[in-house]
Amino acid sequence: MFHVKHLYAMGRARTMTKKLLMGNEAFAHAALEAGVRVVAGYPGTPSSELIETVAKLHDDGAARGIHVEWSTNEKSALELLAGASYTGARCLFTCKQVGLNVASDALMSLNYVGVKGGMVLFVADDPGPISSQTEQDTRRFASFAKLPVLDPATPDQGFAMMQAAFDLSERYHTPVIVRPTTRINHASTFFDVADATDARPVPDEGFERDPKWVIFPRRAYQAHGEINERLAAIAHDFAV
């Protein structure tokens, strides 16, 4: 059973250093410590610093075994990550709230297909707005897409939720949204973070040919019921 207490009990047996980090920098470290292997997204405030941090750590040799990129757009990024997830790799998607509109076509089908390697969608909302066209609330989008959302109130919560989201995704074979807001993304506080990380290895079997990776109407009919059951199970686990 996945319990909410797991959000605050993530074991990390590495050499650690205390650093003053912006929220987005901390989210990057959290994902790397969780073993993320493929990171892709499209830039836009307040989300951009996450991928910039991952790329810098990779260039410095502190984030080993990963692929990180700015994609052509949000839809391309999510489709790339879907393929990586089907091999068992842990994947992280990043965008700002309006960017999720661009990825929505892939996202709606992806939830019906499901995932293998943990897939986390880091979608930064911008109440205000401070740097966006709209105040779009990703929680409404997630309800429409029938996806679980972890909604941190502080950078510390966000760090823990980012790590836990990968486990939640793999346990229930669903993408999971982590939804910080501008004040969380750009707040700074101290974190104990790993000096170096390694991406989690892809399972030996890698990608396996299976009809479930292709969503046709008959499969979609079955998957819709499975999604409803999955959400009920997640809600129950977080309620006990």
Where do the model's predicted regions map?
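N-terminal amphipathic/hydrophobic targeting modules at extreme N-termini
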Residues: M1-L7
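Intrinsically disordered, low-complexity regions
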Residues: V4, G99, K212-W213
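Thiamine diphosphate
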Residues: M10-P155, A160, T181-I184, D198
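Flexible, low-complexity linker and terminal segments
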Residues: A13-N24, P152, D156-V240
